[in-house]
Swiss-Prot record:
Protein name listed in UniProt: Aspartate/glutamate leucyltransferase
Domain of life: Bacteria
Subcellular location: Cytoplasm
Catalytic reactions on record: N-terminal L-glutamyl-[protein] + L-leucyl-tRNA(Leu) = N-terminal L-leucyl-L-glutamyl-[protein] + tRNA(Leu) + H(+); N-terminal L-aspartyl-[protein] + L-leucyl-tRNA(Leu) = N-terminal L-leucyl-L-aspartyl-[protein] + tRNA(Leu) + H(+)
Origin species: Brucella anthropi (strain ATCC 49188 / DSM 6882 / CCUG 24695 / JCM 21032 / LMG 3331 / NBRC 15819 / NCTC 12168 / Alc 37) (Ochrobactrum anthropi)
Length: 249
């Protein structure tokens, strides 16, 4: 008898651990490996079903007593900037975001390290080495890319390249129905630029220009201050028991 390779993903459940978003809660996750020639297709389906990707793992919360994590995606074609978002967009019009293959660099890691040390010193990623960072970027079988944001240089209008220092980076999956922002980081010394907001706005513009309807932001947790920024980008949809439901804020 000829052995047939496993095509359907196998799912596993993590042990309980402290929730990083809600104090006093415990979290569990269901996860599967994204490998093989079906990795892109499976990643698309799972992301549309509320999963997130980390390296070659797709996961989603499977907590026993809590359902606070809600998957969020922006409706790129209907999105309208608020006055404050227009200010952020204009303030950063000296930046150029350039798409690269998902390959790490020492310059990226230096910015990543600076970001973690300033913003997430006690977080779960705080002790990541340069090798850990390289794995985060490269260890994938799906269609993903790096977007580097730099200041415009004297020849930027000719070359379409930013010539200045690297000030922000996004790791982004390109899916059949949208862009999924896997992880992003930026210079912690440029608070006035609101670079996190700017990168989301840039992804919305990129998705709309490519004819992709959605930008996936991951999970929103009501009551978690670090997650509140996600519901400012409307209209958006939240994934619930009845599927994706429109949310206007």
């Amino acid at each position: 008898m000829t052995h047939q390779p496993q095509q359907s993903p196998q799912f596993f459940l993590t042990a309980p651990s402290p929730c990083p978003y809600l104090e006093g809660q415990m979290e569990r996750k269901v996860f599967t490996h994204l490998v093989g020639d079906k990795a892109n297709e499976i990643n698309d389906l799972l992301t549309q079903g509320g999963f997130r990707r980390s390296q070659n793992i797709a996961y989603r919360p499977a907590c026993e007593l809590c359902r606070a994590c809600i998957s969020v995606r922006i409706l790129a074609g209907e999105f309208k900037m608020t006055r404050n978002m227009r200010r952020v967009w204009t303030q950063n019009n000296d930046l150029i975001g350039r798409v690269h293959k998902a390959q790490p660099s020492t310059e990226q890691y230096a910015l990543f390290r600076d970001y973690l040390d300033a913003r997430h010193r006690s977080g779960g990623m705080s002790d990541m080495t340069v090798l850990d960072y390289a794995m985060m970027i490269e260890d994938t079988h799906v269609n993903t890319q790096i977007i580097e944001y730099r200041k415009r240089g004297p020849e930027s209008f000719i070359s379409a390249k930013g010539d200045g220092e690297l000030i922000a980076v996004a790791l982004t999956d390109v899916m059949a129905d949208g862009l999924s922002m896997v992880y992003s980081f930026f210079s912690p010394h440029m608070h006035d630029r609101s670079l996190g907001t700017y990168m989301i706005l840039d992804h919305i513009q990129r998705a709309h220009a490519a004819g992709l309807p959605h930008v996936y932001l991951g999970y929103w947790v009501e009551g978690s201050r670090k997650m509140q920024y996600k519901i400012r980008f409307t209209p958006q949809e939240h994934l619930g028991p009845r599927g994706w439901q429109r949310f206007e804020g």
